[in-house]
């Protein structure tokens, strides 16, 4: 199979925010996963796990969404500020019915953002909160001058305003965020976003709550009634091979279920195409971005764990889903401005799993490591034939071509030749991950069963690079031209 790469032409920039992450007050994502508190014996800096922070910085995390998720539309931010011993508790009704002590609040979130060196995406409460509550939260976070909320922030120990790049006006308001009709939410969005004020010269990117999967009527209604008041419109889509009620095991599955999982991941392409077409009717300049701020695999919770904690193992199959989906996002880079995989630690398709002091990087983490070269790179058009089980991305940054390939077949090797318009000078780097079985994964007893290795099964001749891509693998090769 030969694929011709048009590397002398300019393409669309792949927003680094496509590689965003999501941390909800859910299970052990925040508590134990990211935040252990200042008094924990687990090594931490101001309460944040040092090992987890360093691992996320290694994959160049660009943005983190918080506090939810369904939790966002129950969260009242004033309960999470001030001395920890005085903070109100609440019951996390969506996720396990546990009592939330609110020790991780606004100040702690922005401390985490500072340590991660990434941007903040805060999700406001429309479902059970007031316009005033949301407005005051924005003021508390971003107001540098003299004001009631800025003064309150200073009383709580933080003199300067923080930078909040993204703000979500509600979450899943078609469901857990209020069971609203799109017409009703569109009016609420128009009202609430009015009071997401910009203090100073730092613009806040406003994200409207968008559709669940293929609810094209929701997208149509929001765009028709409020597109000029939003910067982004969200979309949520999860992959669960057996269906919503019985989602299937993360570890025990057969080849047919592997195939269904990959096919469902590929459905993201149709979703983005159809939602984009609706948005194009009202926004032909494609100013409003699609914000896929919840995506990934969602399997049945691991046996013996709280089903409300959504803890699942992560295998090479999850790595296939990650690569397939990221390649689709790149294809739709003109419209997809941000995406946030669910979730960062210990929940759903996590990058990292923790158990006490132990930490494991998942196969999905390694895909984000392999693909980080595409952040803010330009897509490159190509044409040619390839197998139905091959998906790839080609991008360039300065004089380097980055080629990432996923072979989600369960057996056999695919031979691919990529032909450039100019000669190849050298191979800067070639790395990959591969599974020796369909459920290959890392756990606390075997933390490195799936790791990034050097990829050597390639040949370069003049303007061509030939690859022998094994089954169940994801690779990235970087070439200078």
Regions found by a protein language model. Give the residues of each.
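Active-site His/acidic residue clusters
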Residues: 238-259, 305
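Histidine-centered catalytic micro-motifs
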Residues: 235
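Beta-strand-rich domain onsets/edges
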Residues: 263-264
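Non-catalytic accessory regions flanking glycosidase/transglycosidase catalytic cores in CAZymes
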Residues: 1-232, 268-269, 273-301, 305-481
């Amino acid at each position: 199979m030969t694929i011709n790469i048009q590397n002398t032409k300019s393409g669309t920039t792949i927003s680094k925010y496509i590689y965003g992450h999501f941390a909800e007050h859910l299970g052990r994502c925040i508590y134990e996963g990211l935040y252990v508190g200042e008094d924990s014996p687990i090594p931490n800096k101001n309460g944040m796990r040092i090992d987890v922070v360093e691992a996320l910085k290694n994959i160049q995390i660009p943005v983190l969404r918080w506090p939810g998720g369904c939790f966002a539309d129950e969260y009242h931010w004033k309960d999470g500020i001030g001395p920890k011993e005085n903070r109100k508790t609440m019951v996390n009704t969506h996720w396990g019915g546990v009592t939330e002590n609110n020790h991780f609040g606004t100040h702690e979130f922005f401390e985490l953002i500072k340590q991660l060196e990434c941007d903040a995406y805060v999700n406001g409460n429309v479902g059970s909160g007031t316009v005033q509550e949301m407005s005051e939260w924005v003021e508390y976070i971003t107001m540098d001058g003299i004001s009631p909320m800025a003064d309150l922030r200073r009383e709580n120990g933080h003199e300067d305003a923080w930078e909040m790049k993204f703000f979500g006006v509600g979450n899943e308001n078609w469901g857990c965020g209020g069971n609203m009709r799109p017409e009703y939410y569109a009016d609420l969005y128009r009202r609430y976003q009015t009071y997401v004020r910009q203090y100073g010269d730092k613009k806040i990117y406003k994200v409207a709550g968008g559709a669940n999967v293929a609810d094209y009527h929701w997208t149509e209604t929001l765009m028709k009634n409020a597109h000029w008041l939003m910067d982004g419109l969200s979309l949520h889509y999860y992959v669960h091979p057996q269906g919503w009620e019985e989602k299937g095991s993360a570890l025990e599955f057969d080849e047919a279920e592997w195939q269904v999982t990959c096919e469902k991941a590929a459905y993201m392409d149709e979703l983005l195409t159809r939602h984009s077409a609706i948005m194009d009717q009202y926004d032909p300049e494609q100013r409003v971005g699609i914000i896929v701020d919840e995506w990934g695999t969602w399997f049945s919770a691991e046996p013996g764990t709280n089903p409300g904690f959504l803890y699942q193992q992560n295998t090479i199959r999850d790595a296939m889903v990650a690569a397939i989906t990221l390649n689709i996002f790149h294809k739709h880079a003109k419209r997809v401005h941000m995406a946030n995989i669910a979730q960062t630690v210990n929940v759903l398709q996590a990058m990292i799993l923790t158990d006490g002091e132990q930490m494991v990087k998942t196969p999905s983490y390694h895909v984000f490591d392999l693909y980080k070269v595409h952040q803010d790179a330009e897509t490159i058009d190509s044409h040619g034939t390839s197998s139905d089980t091959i998906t790839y991305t080609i991008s360039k940054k300065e004089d380097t071509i980055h080629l990432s390939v996923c072979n989600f077949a369960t057996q056999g090797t695919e031979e691919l030749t990529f032909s450039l318009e100019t000669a190849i000078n050298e191979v800067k780097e070639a790395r990959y991950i591969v599974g020796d079985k369909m459920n290959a994964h890392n756990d606390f007893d075997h933390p490195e069963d799936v790791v990034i290795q050097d990829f050597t099964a390639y040949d370069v001749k003049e303007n061509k690079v030939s690859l022998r891509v094994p089954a169940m693998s994801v690779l990235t090769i970087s070439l200078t031209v």
